[in-house]
Design a protein with these regions (language model features):
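Alpha-amylase-like alpha-glycosidases and glucanotransferases acting on alpha-linked glucans and related
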Residues: 1-38, 63-205
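Conserved, well-ordered alpha-helix/loop/beta-strand core segments that scaffold catalytic motifs
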Residues: 30, 35-63
């Protein structure tokens, strides 16, 4: 979508109405595909659960820059007025890579997420809990602190650690889904005492 015409990249409310009308057939087709998938998946999940099999789903912490999420809600991300990221995700240098890993995903504007009581995130978890019995948070450590890299960097060397939402995020999660939400914390990468403390405080395996 970053290469679309401006009226499609950043449509006004009235332009959205025109787009929805002009692309009605295409939109309905995509909705049908989504409905078909969810119907088939719910049947598969029911089949597994009836046989005492639990499904573990993955929720990656970051989304792609060209995703519908960034297009629909650019305020949730650190992007410029055209939708391009100003800082991106990655990890610092380690034993496996002398220059780190430059993932390129746009980073969240956590201050804005906090103002909205993490509504987008809670909706995301709500959907994932419908699809899976247990949810694994991919790159859990990024909710404690994450590696922020200038978007014009060619490697991850110029990054820095920035605080994530930490306790506040998980307290909101508990308020939304109960004391023991079915979550697994992935612990790959640079795991510090602070990351372990956050995991243990909320009893996440």
């Amino acid at each position: 979508w970053l290469e679309w015409e401006k009226k499609y990249r950043k449509p006004t409310k009235s332009q959205k109405a025109v787009i929805e009308r002009d692309l009605e057939d295409e939109i309905l087709y995509e909705k049908f595909l989504q409905w078909t998938f969810f119907r088939q998946w719910s049947q598969l999940k029911a089949y597994a659960n009836e046989r005492d099999i639990l499904l573990i789903g993955d929720i990656p912490i970051f989304v792609s820059g060209d995703s519908s999420d960034v297009w629909a809600e650019p305020r949730l991300f650190q992007v410029d007025s055209d939708g391009f990221p100003t800082v991106v995700a990655g990890v610092p240098p380690d034993y496996f890579s002398a220059t780190g890993q430059l993932w390129g995903n746009p980073l969240y504007d956590w201050k804005y997420h906090k103002k909205t009581n993490y509504t987008w995130w809670m909706d995301r978890f709500k959907t994932q809990f419908l699809l899976s019995d247990i949810v694994r948070i991919d790159h859990f450590r990024g909710l404690e602190s994450y590696w922020e890299i200038p978007a014009d960097s060619e490697t991850a060397l110029n990054g820095k650690w920035v605080d994530g939402p930490k306790d506040d995020f998980f307290e909101t999660l508990i308020q939304s889904f109960g004391e023991e939400p079915p979550i697994i914390a992935e612990d790959l990468g640079i795991i510090t005492d602070e990351v372990r403390a956050l995991r243990d405080k909320f009893g996440l395996p």
